[in-house]
């Protein structure tokens, strides 16, 4: 057998979705920011009064826990942010001034995700946050997701190279309270609505790219999601008798690509 080391450059992020109102006050820096282009700035300018100033000025990257010291530093920063929002540890539990405890459940449909969220749960406990996870069957998971009956779930939002009408279902306020919609976060933001419309009705490719970048920036700065995991490759074990094209496509799903293009060596 051999091992295919290189695969698509397609990003494969999975983001847990918060569904717990008190978490809005955590003010955790959970977004990725990059330089804002001239066209993107011009598109966002009419909404400046409704957006944080950092949207226009800062390049932001998520904190990296590089060893125990890095993790400790991140936890200390999180503790400071929580305290500034009125959350303090009392009797070993994080509470606000009204005595409301910060606790939530992560809903899972795949057993393998337990080992992924467990370190997250353990780190939250160091801040006095009581978090746990529950594994349910796929049917119940889908039902609870459709009806927004969850505190937090693990989910991925697949995107194409030409975003369009589907963005309305993902982010628009019209889909926020619609049962079964893809707006699992429940976003209701007039700026997001306006930018979604810019994407959907973009007159040309350049306008589409600018609108998509602007929407992406605003969504990330909204801190609706916690980046969960990422890998730039597909890990594929295969028999040495199989062969594949020397030039890989930029974007592809592993299984269909293998079925359609691989062959048996002669």
Question: How should these model regions be labeled?
Answer:
Residues 1-25:
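A glycine-/small-polar-enriched, mobile loop at the entrance of the PLP active site in fold-type I
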Residues 20-27, 114, 118:
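Short, surface-exposed alpha-helical segments at coil->helix boundaries
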Residues 90-96, 132-135, 211:
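Surface-exposed patches in mature extracellular/periplasmic domains of secreted proteins
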Residues 120-131:
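Short alpha-helix C-terminal cap/hinge motif
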Residues 133-143:
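Short helix-initiation/N-cap motifs at beta->coil->alpha
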Residues 72-105:
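Immediate post-signal peptide segment of exported/extracytoplasmic ligand-binding proteins
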Residues 100-110, 131-134, 151:
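Short, well-ordered beta-strand elements
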Residues 31-62, 75-79, 112-122, 143-266:
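Detector for C-terminal structural segments
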